[in-house]
Regions:
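Structured C-terminal cap/extension of enzyme domains
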Residues: 203-205
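Short, acidic, Ser/Thr-enriched surface-loop or helix-capping motifs
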Residues: 195-196
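Phosphate/diphosphate-binding loops
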Residues: 185-192
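N-terminal beta-alpha lobe that positions the nucleotide/phosphoryl donor
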Residues: 1-178, 187
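Short, His- and charge-rich active-site/binding loops that engage polyanionic ligands
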Residues: 207-212
Length: 212
């Protein structure tokens, strides 16, 4: 049986965070519970791992991270720029590109949201919410590019700082990508049951705005 590279929301649940990231697993859990969720699929983290291996980037990325001085903003920014360029400029393997494009066609929509979903996201000790990039109103023509940009956002300056702040710089962190049908929402928002900055467990934060 061939290894699955993508899974629909209907195939995922809260126990799948290690393959679909926190966001992907949560969307699957809500879909399974019958909550109205715009349909979509998750490009599993294994694809990112396979992508950087096939592009021969693993050692190069590790070497750059190992030599970062996280207390020097210039050092972090230079490292971030180098790693992101490596990921964005590498060629996506044909079989991976084909599966992602086929899944997109199955959604039957013109526009999708392409959203990063870290495998360490929404954990008890670390919340990666807001650390990685997402792209709205993405069309088929630039879908693969935006997927690679989501992968690259694992190494933005803020994400690198966050790694060191949480002591995760030596921990393997991967990233899945959510591809979800766009909707014309009137209001959208996010809620944190623990304050994401102060980590105060007695304070809940809800942020909302018009549109998406």
């Amino acid at each position: 049986m061939s290894l699955k590279l993508t899974l629909n929301f209907t195939e995922l649940g809260k126990g799948d965070a290690m393959i679909a990231g926190g966001k992907g697993a949560s969307l699957g859990e809500m879909t399974q519970a019958g909550i109205p969720v715009p349909p979509g699929f998750v490009v599993l983290f294994i694809i990112f791992d396979e992508f950087i291996k096939e592009a021969d980037l693993v050692q190069e990325i590790d070497n750059i991270i190992d030599n970062v001085n996280h207390k020097d903003i210039n050092s972090v920014e230079v490292a971030s720029e180098k790693i992101q360029a490596l990921i964005k400029n590498a060629k996506m393997p044909e079989r991976i590109a084909k599966e992602i494009n086929e899944k997109f066609k199955d959604l039957g929509t013109e526009f999708v949201a392409v959203r990063s979903s870290a495998t360490a996201e929404d954990g008890a000790d670390n919340a990666w919410a807001g650390q990685l990039d997402s792209f709205l109103n993405t069309k088929e023509a630039n879908l693969l590019e935006k997927v690679q940009h989501c992968w690259a956002s694992l190494f933005t300056p803020r994400a690198i700082f966050y790694r060191f702040e949480k002591g995760l710089h030596t921990t393997k962190i991967s990233v899945a990508v959510v591809v979800q049908k766009m909707v014309n929402s009137e209001i959208s928002g996010i809620a944190f049951s623990v304050h994401p900055v102060t980590e105060d467990r007695n304070q809940m934060i809800i942020e909302a705005g018009f549109g998406f």
